Amino acid sequence: MTEQELIKAALAEDLAGGVDITSQATIAADATSVADFVARMDGVIAGINIAHAVLAEVGLTDVTLFKKDGDQVKVGDVLITVRGNTRAILLAERTALNFFGHLSGIATLTSKWVAAVSGTKCQVRDTRKTTPGMRTIEKYAVRMGGGTNHRMNLSDAALIKDNHIAAAGGVVAAFTQVRSAYPKAEIEIEVDNLAQLKEVLPQQPDLVLLDNMSPELCAQAVALAKGTCKLEASGGISIASARAYAQSGVDYIAIGALTHSAPVFDIGLDLRAE
């Protein structure tokens, strides 16, 4: 889904009954207010432009952005100020905060992983473990936190995993079938042990995914590969162990948690009279 489609769908979800009955009952139709979006915690933000687009979608045009995506913010920082119709502000509030808080949570978590491997050549990469319909914006948030994107979709590159290997009859068989069918595609192949790595290296893969290997085994894999392909560690990696994996010499660590387990970044909306 496009960003605009997501916004329209989210607002429609809130107005499924046709009207905000609380605002309708308590706020005059022509009432105006000023509202500030305020950071309730420290972190890295993403989604400020989406929050802005939500406000625009309900007709709010007097909007000031004080920060930009990728900025480090602190508790109490005012991120956005909006002036306009009070009912419209409250209609947009939850949808804007949902997007803004979710994406800033991803950016903030990603920045912590990136900090954990700082000073090494290792990059933190995301996965396709994203919220259905929100992959593009979630992967954008990863970039804002300093991370790197893996595939956006199944056509971007080949990633031969254990089920493909089982179906094809082995590591080499799976690789050669993909290479034959898509000779120009980037191919990454998953291996569970060093024996599989030794088997696939002569096929000259672009990348090899080291699945659930310890940092020590990853270091051995790096020595075996001798720089002939990129190596990515995946599975069983915590933020506490990330540096050990990075220091093993792998090029990437794949972290599904960046998008599937990021806590929401706390942002509040404070309304005040005009």
Residue map of PLM features:
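Acidic/glycine-rich phosphate/pyrophosphate-binding loops and surrounding catalytic core
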Residues: 1-203, 207, 216-224, 230-232, ...
